[in-house]
């Protein structure tokens, strides 16, 4: 088992967020060569007693799944981060804990992100669904597309809706959760929940005592009890990035935080890279739509955040989706990952050209980046107009919003 790469998920709620908005963001730090895709799945009614095939195992399907949009490593079923039609956003962090994560194939933390989005109408309902599935099926299996080594982790989640956020941290089937109703919060690759636990597994403390990790005499501190002895519990650079913001936090603020390499929030190392990013704005006024911005490409400092709004007729974006290999996918065969197919989608390939220009040609790179940021700015301003309008947007005008943004970006790269 290797250490989890530095990865950060954020939320800002009023009064720290601007104009009665909840702002959510995440950088997904993954192996450098891994491709993430952005995929929309409509709401679906399912047959009774049907199954859903997750990354490694199949579980019982529910009668109806909600419409979702997710950013995910292209080889797996679940999601690193995403949102659903009810304004629920979930992000996952891989964490190391005192108890090693199981290598036995079960549900991945990323599967639980997607399952929570497909089945939950609020952040709390999604949390309840995740811990129920965790208890029934467990978590385990390889987090990376790697035939030579199994990289298994415990999982933490940030679950957000228009009203509140929840931090959920899990160790095996055991878990603890904290409700956040105001201010800012960041989670990273370390257990962060301390003594304020709003909900927990009914046997959490008994289990800790049985392992000799807690005597029962002193106050129960979840992170101290379940973290490895050498873990630094105070090293979440992302929390500092949020707390030092003097102005109200906006979508642009969150984007700037995600692009910050100096703080370590945007990772670009020999082994790992921020392979995709998301920012969502959830208005507490329910007459305004939630807006979700995805990059679909690596390194947010060299990517464009493109908006998505849920409507009944969303136009699919195949240019941001990886090739499908069906049952021949090496991730679905056992032994797994014996081959590594080319999972790059069209947007990813176009973005590779842009990255090469930025890295190799200083003048052309500056010009290219300036134009990219201008394109992004136009999108942000158009979305601000939608949020400030007393009327909901015309579904016909926003159903192809993400499609048009991807198309414009690719034409520009060409």
UniProtKB/Swiss-Prot annotation:
Please name the gene that encodes this protein. Answer: Scrn1
InterPro entries xref list: Peptidase_C69 (IPR005322)
Q: Which Pfam families match?
A: Peptidase_C69
Please name the PANTHER family in this protein's record. Answer: SECERNIN, SECERNIN-1
**Cellular component annotations (GO), alphabetically ordered:** cytoplasm; nuclear membrane; presynapse
Name by which UniProt lists this protein: Secernin-1
Q: Which UniProt keywords apply?
A: Cytoplasm, Exocytosis
Q: Where is the signal peptide?
A: none
Localization in the cell? Cytoplasm
Q: Which family does it belong to?
A: Belongs to the peptidase C69 family. Secernin subfamily.
Q: What more is known?
A: 'Secern' is an archaic English term meaning 'secrete'.
Organism of provenance: Mus musculus (Mouse)
Q: What does this protein do?
A: Regulates exocytosis in mast cells. Increases both the extent of secretion and the sensitivity of mast cells to stimulation with calcium.
Q: Where mainly found?
A: cytoplasm
Q: What is the lineage of its organism?
A: Eukaryota, Metazoa, Chordata, Craniata, Vertebrata
List the GO biological process terms. exocytosis; proteolysis; regulation of synaptic vesicle cycle
Give one GO term, molecular function aspect.
Answer: dipeptidase activity
């Amino acid at each position: 088992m290797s250490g989890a790469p530095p990865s950060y998920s954020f939320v800002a709620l009023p009064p720290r967020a601007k104009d009665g908005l909840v702002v959510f963001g995440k950088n997904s730090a993954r192996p450098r060569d891994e491709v993430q895709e952005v995929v929309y799945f409509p709401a679906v009614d399912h047959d009774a007693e049907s199954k859903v095939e997750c990354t490694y195992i199949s579980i019982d399907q529910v009668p109806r799944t909600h419409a979702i949009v997710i950013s995910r490593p292209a080889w797996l079923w679940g999601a690193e981060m995403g949102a659903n039609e009810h304004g629920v956003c979930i992000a996952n962090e891989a964490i190391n804990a005192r108890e090693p994560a199981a290598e036995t194939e079960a549900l991945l933390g990323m599967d639980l992100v997607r399952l929570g989005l497909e089945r939950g109408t609020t952040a709390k309902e999604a949390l309840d669904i995740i811990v129920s599935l965790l208890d029934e099926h467990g978590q385990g299996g390889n987090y990376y597309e790697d035939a030579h080594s199994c990289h298994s982790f415990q999982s933490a989640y940030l679950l957000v809706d228009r009203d509140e956020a929840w931090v959920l941290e899990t160790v095996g089937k055991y878990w603890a959760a904290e409700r956040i109703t105001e201010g800012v919060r960041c989670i990273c690759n370390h257990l962060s929940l301390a003594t304020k636990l709003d909900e927990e597994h009914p046997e959490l403390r008994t289990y800790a005592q049985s392992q000799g990790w807690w005597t029962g005499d002193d106050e129960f501190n979840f992170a101290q009890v379940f973290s490895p002895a050498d873990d630094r519990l105070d090293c979440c650079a992302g929390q500092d990035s949020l707390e030092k913001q003097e102005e109200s936090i906006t979508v642009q603020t969150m984007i700037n935080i995600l692009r910050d390499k100096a703080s370590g929030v945007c990772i670009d190392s020999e082994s790992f890279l921020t392979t995709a990013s998301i920012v969502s704005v959830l208005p507490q006024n329910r007459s305004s739509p939630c807006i979700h911005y995805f990059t679909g490409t690596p390194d947010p400092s060299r990517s464009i955040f493109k908006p998505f709004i849920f409507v009944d007729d969303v136009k699919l974006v195949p240019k941001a989706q990886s090739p499908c290999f069906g049952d021949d996918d090496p991730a679905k065969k056992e032994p797994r990952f014996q081959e590594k197919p080319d999972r790059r989608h069209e947007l990813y390939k176009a973005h590779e050209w842009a990255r090469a220009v930025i890295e190799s040609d200083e003048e052309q790179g500056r010009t290219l980046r300036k134009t990219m940021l201008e394109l992004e700015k136009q999108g942000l301003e158009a979305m601000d107009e939608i949020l400030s309008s007393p009327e909901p947007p015309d579904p016909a005008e926003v159903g192809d919003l993400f499609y048009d943004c991807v198309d414009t970006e690719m034409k520009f790269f060409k």
